[in-house]
Amino acid sequence: MKDSAEFQEKKDLRKKRLQGKAIKNVGILWPYLLIPIHLITLKPLLFYLKTVIIDFFLLQFKVKWGWKKTSIAQVTDVIDEGIPFLPEKSDIYLDFINFWIRSLNFTVLRLGRKKALPHLAGFMAAIGTAYHEAARVYKIRMSTTPRPAVGKNKNMQTIHRLDPHLLCVPSLHVGVVVLTHTFFTAVFRQEGLSQEEQEQYSTELWEGAVEIAETVLYVKQHSVNCIPAALYMMTHLLKDQFTIQDAINFIDCLFVDTSHISAEQGKVIRNHIHYMFDRLLLEGCNEDDWIVPVLRWLMSQPVTEV
C-alpha cells in the first residue's frame, strides 16, 4: 500500500509540474541522456541513424559529388509558383527534429523514466521505419524542385548546404510530423492522461504538424506533390492509427489561417493535395506495396539526368 501511495504521489507531482505547460516549452534533454544508454532504445536508435546517414544523406551526396549517375524527377507544379518564398519561416522548418524530440522529452517528464522507455523505443523504431520506407522510393527514383536563391538568410544557407534536395517525394518532414502527432496522441490515451491533458497536447501536436507541413512549401523545400505522397505512405505505415480520414482532415487544415496567401489560393492548394492523395489511394488499392503508385507517378514526370 505504501509503494502504491508513493507511486501515485510521484505521478501526481509529475502532472502538477507540467500543468499549464506546452510540450514546446519542456526542452529536449532527457532523450539525449536516456536513449543511448538503454538497450531497448539503443537498438532502434542505431537503426534510425544508420538509415538517415546511408539512405538519406549519403544517397544524395553520392549524386551531388558525381559518384553516382541517376535520373531525377522534376516534381514541381504550377501551383507552387503561387506560394511565396518566405525564408523567415526557416526556423519552423528546422524545428522539425526538435518537434519530435520535445515530445519524447515530455513523455519522460510526464510518465517517469521507467514507464517512458518503451514509448521512446517504440517511437525510434517507428521513425526509423519511416525513413527506411521512404528510402525505398528514393533509391529507385530521386526527385527535386527548383529552389530560389537564399540571399543572406543563415538558416536557408545551412539548409541548402546540408541538403542536396534530391529526395522530395515522399516528404519525410510531413511524414514524421504526422507520425509524431499520431504516436504520442496514442501514448497519452494509453497511459490514461486526463481528457483535458489529452486534448491539450494532441491539439498542440496537430497544430505544430500542420504548421511545419505548410512551411516545407514556404521555404521551397517541397512541392504540393510531395505532401500527398507522404500522407499516403503514413496511412500504410501507421495503418489503423492514421486513417484515410485522418489524412483528409490534415489536408483540410492546410493553408486555412494564413495571411501569406489568399483564401482562394489556399483552396487551390488543398484541392490539389486531395486530388493527388485520392489518386494514390485509387491506384494503390489493388497493389501489395504502397510504393507502387508513388513510383508510377514519379516515373511519369520529366527527369534530369545527372
Regions found by a protein language model. Give the residues of each.
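Functional transmembrane or membrane-interface alpha-helices that line membrane-embedded catalytic
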Residues: 193-202, 231, 236-260
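Primarily interfacial, aromatic-capped hydrophobic alpha-helices that serve as membrane anchors
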Residues: 245-306
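Non-catalytic, membrane-anchoring transmembrane segments at the edges
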Residues: 6-12, 16-17, 45-46, 233, ...
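Charged/polar, low-hydrophobicity segments characteristic of intrinsically disordered regions
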Residues: 136-142, 217-231, 270-275
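Alpha-helical transmembrane segments that form the membrane-embedded catalytic/substrate-binding core
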Residues: 176-180, 211-214, 218-245
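Hydrophobic alpha-helical bundle signature of multipass membrane enzymes
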Residues: 7-167, 176-214
